[in-house]
Swiss-Prot record:
GO terms for cellular component: urease complex. InterPro entries: Urease_beta-like (IPR002019), Urease_betasu_sf (IPR036461), Urease_subunit (IPR050069). The lineage of its organism: Bacteria, Pseudomonadati, Pseudomonadota, Alphaproteobacteria, Hyphomicrobiales. The gene is ureB. GO terms for biological process: urea catabolic process. It comes from Rhizobium meliloti (strain 1021) (Ensifer meliloti). Its EC number is 3.5.1.5. This is Urease subunit beta.
Length: 101
C-alpha cells in the first residue's frame, strides 16, 4: 500500500443510496457562468439561477463530494437534489435560513 492510497471495494459504488431525490429545471438568466458545489444549500444559490427555490429548500446536488455543476449563461438544465443530512441546520451561504430547516 502506498501512503494515501485508497483501495475501493470491487464493483459499483452507489452514492447517496436510498435518499429521496427531486429533479428540478434550472436556468442561468445571468451573463456569467455560475458554479454550484456539491454541498451548497441549493435554495440559496446565485439569484441569477431561476428555479423553484421552495422545492430546493433543505437540499443539495446529488453529485460526488467535492465536485460542482456549472451553469453557463443562458443555459437550462435538469439537476437532481437530495436532502441535506445530519442536524439539518443551515448557516452562512446567503444567510436565508441561519438555523434549523
Amino acid at each position: 500500500m502506498i501512503p494515501g492510497e485508497i483501495i475501493a471495494a470491487a464493483g459499483e459504488i452507489e452514492l447517496n443510496a436510498g435518499l429521496e431525490t427531486v429533479s428540478i429545471e434550472v436556468a442561468n438568466s445571468g451573463d456569467r457562468p455560475v458554479q454550484v458545489g456539491s454541498h451548497y444549500h441549493f435554495a440559496e444559490t446565485n439569484p441569477g439561477l431561476i428555479f423553484d427555490r421552495d422545492a430546493a429548500r433543505g437540499k443539495r446536488l446529488d453529485i460526488p463530494a467535492g465536485t460542482a455543476v456549472r451553469f453557463e449563461p443562458g443555459q437550462t438544465r435538469q439537476v437532481t437534489l437530495i436532502p441535506l443530512s445530519g442536524k439539518r441546520e443551515v448557516f452562512g451561504f446567503r444567510q436565508q435560513v441561519m438555523g434549523k430547516l
